[in-house]
């Protein structure tokens, strides 16, 4: 197996394969410096691990003494005491009271995958305890994000006595004050950034509130719900609630929901999050959960589910219901126990996802044209802010993500409405906190509403405030963006030849997974391979084949690259010698295994 030796790097700048500017405009750098290479050697020697796996572990920041534990993440070993989170005791006791009394409970979730899976997880638990909770997922367009006064009043009219908000509620002052006024006690389980003033509720379980010292701010809402259920189970155990007829539920059997929400919300896959996903993937592979299995089947997964499948195939289909269809479809699917009904819902979500893709493509084309005109050929400026009439509010977050990837800087896409207001979403790059900037813009009167976290935010504004908001972002984020873009390089873990790329290699690398945000998938280079062909597939993807000098080849696919610099470089350099960089995946189809490279970048050799 060929691994590029350190001496082939430019040691002063660590340019990998001497690539200073690639097709995507980035330098390639070796992930490991001299200290990192020494750590990799120590990992390999002390733990009897293959050199390449040791290099990957060192690149992830793993120390020699912790390598074996890292390769086998254990929830038992990583699980914190839930009561270390502020208000967890009050929250678990109040929900336990509701279970003991048989109260009427309503779960108010968010319409994204994290909110849907968190709502489903809590609902399944309460059903096991004998309750029949209502799950309310708000309509993105007509209700917007988080609890609203009209919904609260309808819950009170229906006799609900306990409201649990998941993945929302921290900043819902007016709506939750109304809930208190109407006698509806509320528990908030959320992970979004908190303001100084908190709503008047029974408990707010949120590691991102200022007075929380748990250090668990990296958890998704579904992970927080899981910890809350651990605390509730403990509380009910102390009250002798569990019996032979009503045994304590096996929370580990529900980790498929935690894995799906954690990956889809792009929280760091480190520590407990990584263990959640590792064990949740095992649960998904067993195909024991009717709704999740129907979703995997309609998404046509080629092989056992991996984090990439959750984030790019399963998550978008759940999201499609909340974006352009019925917001409750995702929860209905994940709660469904009848296989035929689950299949019907999954097919409907798949149809909505295809419709969403068409809407997204059309909107992206308009947004890119506007961004290109604003930035100019030299792409000057810090933040990309685009807006358009008629844009579907359900896809603006996806459009912002596309713009962020295309231009390598924070991006906002805003759907302008006939009434003179706009609803939009922003996505950021590492090192630039747009959530904080948006909250400050609300306080300064530039936005009607807004919130989020470092990497994603939502905004509502008046159309006539658009220019002022754009100028504010340039001023507030400009220095951070400039610093982040200076560090914009592609980190390479090593180089392999086409002949060394096989299923054994991929399975070995998988031991350091699951990969995702905060635990990046290793990137390898194919040095000086001939680009045998590059073809358009699926309208926007590029499939390529790279051949080594000894005639061995690797098939690669560059997703959504056809109209991007990467796709253009592939089409223009057929039959030339290129360096290629990407991640290796194992594709299982019709009983056969083959390795495919998910192409990230290329450069002339």
Model-derived segments and spans:
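Hydrophobic helix-and-loop "lid/oligomerization" segment in the mid-to-C-terminal part
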Residues: 22, 31-39, 43-161, 182, ...
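Generic start-of-chain signal for non-secretory N-termini
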Residues: 1-42, 97-100, 605
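Mid-to-C-terminal polyanion-binding domains and interfaces
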Residues: 4-5, 21, 97-103, 341-347, ...
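Short gly/pro/ser/thr-enriched loop/turn and capping motifs at secondary-structure boundaries
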Residues: 141-143, 172, 192-197, 211-213, ...
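A residue-level signal for conserved active-site and pocket-lining positions in enzyme catalytic cores
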Residues: 57, 164, 319, 509, ...
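Short alpha-helices
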Residues: 121, 199-243, 254-263
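Short, glycine/polar-rich helix-capping loops at beta-to-alpha or helix-loop-helix junctions
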Residues: 189-200, 446
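Active-site core of PLP-dependent enzymes with the aminotransferase class I/II
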Residues: 166-180
């Amino acid at each position: 197996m060929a691994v590029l030796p350190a001496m082939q790097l430019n040691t002063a700048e660590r340019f990998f394969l001497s690539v200073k500017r690639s097709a995507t405009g980035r330098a390639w750098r070796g992930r490991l410096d001299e200290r990192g290479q020494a750590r990799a050697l120590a990992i390999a020697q002390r733990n009897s691990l293959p050199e390449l796996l040791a290099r990957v572990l060192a690149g992830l920041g793993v120390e020699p003494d912790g390598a074996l534990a890292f390769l086998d993440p254990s929830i038992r070993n990583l699980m914190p005491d839930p009561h270390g989170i502020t208000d967890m005791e009050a929250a678990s006791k109040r929900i336990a009271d509701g279970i003991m009394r048989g109260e009427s409970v309503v779960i108010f979730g968010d319409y994204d995958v994290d909110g849907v899976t968190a709502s489903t997880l809590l609902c399944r638990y309460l059903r096991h305890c004998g309750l029949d909770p209502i799950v309310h997922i708000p309509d993105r367009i007509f209700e917007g994000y988080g609890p609203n006064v009209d919904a609260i009043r309808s819950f009170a009219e229906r006799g609900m006595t306990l409201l649990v908000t998941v993945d929302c509620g921290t900043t819902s002052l007016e709506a939750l004050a109304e809930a208190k006024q109407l006698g509806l006690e509320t528990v908030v389980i959320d992970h979004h950034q908190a303001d100084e003033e908190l709503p008047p509720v029974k408990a707010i379980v949120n590691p991102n509130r200022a007075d929380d010292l748990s250090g668990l701010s990296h958890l998704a809402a579904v992970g927080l719900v899981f910890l809350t259920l651990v605390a509730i189970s403990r509380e009910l155990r102390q009250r002798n609630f569990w019996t032979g007829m009503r045994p304590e539920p096996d929370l580990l059997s529900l980790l498929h929901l935690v894995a799906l929400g954690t990956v889809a919300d792009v929280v760091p896959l480190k520590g407990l999050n990584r263990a959640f996903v590792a064990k949740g993937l095992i649960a998904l592979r067993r195909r024991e959960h009717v709704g999740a299995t129907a979703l995997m089947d309609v998404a046509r997964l080629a092989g056992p589910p991996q984090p990439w499948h959750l984030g790019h195939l399963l998550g978008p289909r759940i999201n499609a219901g909340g974006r352009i269809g019925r917001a409750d479809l995702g929860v209905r699917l994940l709660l469904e126990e009848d296989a035929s009904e689950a299949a019907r819902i999954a097919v409907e979500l798949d149809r909505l996802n295809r419709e969403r893709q068409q809407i997204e493509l059309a909107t992206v084309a308009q947004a890119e044209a506007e961004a290109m005109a604003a930035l100019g050929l030299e792409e000057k400026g810090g933040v990309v802010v685009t807006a358009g009439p008629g844009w579907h509010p359900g896809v603006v977050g996806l459009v912002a993500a596309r713009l962020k990837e295309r231009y390598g800087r924070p991006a906002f896409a805003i759907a302008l409405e006939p009434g003179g207001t706009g609803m939009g979403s922003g996505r950021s790059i590492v090192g630039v906190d747009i959530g904080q900037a948006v909250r400050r813009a609300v306080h300064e009167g530039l936005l009607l509403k807004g919130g989020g976290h470092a990497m994603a935010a939502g905004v509502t504004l008046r159309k006539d405030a658009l220019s002022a908001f754009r100028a504010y972002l340039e001023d507030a984020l400009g220095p951070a963006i400039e610093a982040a873009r200076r560090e914009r390089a592609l980190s390479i873990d090593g180089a392999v030849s086409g002949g060394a790329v096989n299923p054994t290699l991929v399975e070995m690398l998988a031991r350091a997974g699951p990969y995702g945000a905060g635990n990046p998938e290793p990137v390898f280079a194919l040095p000086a391979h001939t680009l045998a062909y590059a073809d358009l597939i699926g309208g926007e993807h590029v499939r390529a084949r790279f051949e080594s000098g000894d005639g061995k080849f690797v098939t690669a696919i560059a997703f959504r690259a056809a109209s991007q610099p990467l796709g253009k470089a592939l089409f223009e350099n057929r039959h030339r010698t290129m360096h290629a960089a990407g991640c290796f995946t194992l594709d299982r189809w019709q009983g056969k295994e083959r390795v495919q490279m998910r192409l990230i970048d290329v450069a002339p050799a």
